[in-house]
C-alpha cells in the first residue's frame, strides 16, 4: 500500500496524484483510498488520461471533501449532495462502470448513489487524488 502525504506547498490544489493505468473499457473498475490524517480538503475520482495536472479541476468527476463534508464536483460545477462526512479512518471507494457509463462512490461500504450516468465511454480515464492542506495523508488501498 502506498501513502500520499502533502508536506509542502501551502493551501492549494497542488498535490495531484494520477493513476498510472487506464480504466478497463467495458468493465467495472474499483479502487479505494483511506483517510489517515485529514487537515482540510481532498478530491478524488476520475479524469481523462493525458490531462495537464493544472487542468484537473476543469475535467474531474468526483468528490471534494471540504473538512470532511462531501461536495460533488462535475466538470467545474460544485454542489453539496450529501449530509455525510468523512474523517480519519474513512475508506472511500470509486466505482466506474465503463460499459454503462456510470460513476458512483461509497464510504465505509455504504453506497453514496450514482454520481453521474453519462460518462463518455470512448475516453480513457485514470484515477486521481488531490490534497489541498499540508499534513493531510491518504493511503491507497
Question: Language-model segments: what does each one mean?
Answer:
Residues 1-141:
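PRY/SPRY (B30.2) beta-sandwich protein-interaction domains
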